[in-house]
Amino acid sequence: RLALGHYFGRQLARLVQTISADLVIPLPLHPDRLRSRGFNQALELARPVSKALACPLDASLCQRIRNTQAQADLPWKARRQNIRHAFHCVKDLSGQRIVLVDDVMTTGASLDECARTLRLHGAASIVLLVVARTLPE
């Protein structure tokens, strides 16, 4: 699975050449989920994006502070409530242009909540990058 992450990360990197950014952030996993999975798929995708943009990657700046139920296990309408207040930012991002990377966007609840947290900490702009987008059922 990591090889696929590297492949898709390189494909994302090819698409971002025109983006101006100060920082690349992968959507964080809760530490418990990271331990059980063994890797953060968003981080693996974000590495080549950071390299292509020639800007830093910071996987520790934004943290998942609540171990939420897996979004994929929930009905669409329950996902926003499940992810609410699940993220925390550890430093001020005033004026920073952020690229937030994840693997799949379904309802967008996780990315939206993380972006909300980044904006509350001063991010000037946030570009969301995902490998895949699922369509409503």
List PLM regions with ranges.
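Conserved PRPP/pyrophosphate-binding segment of the phosphoribosyltransferase/PRPP-pathway fold
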Residues: 1-100, 107-137
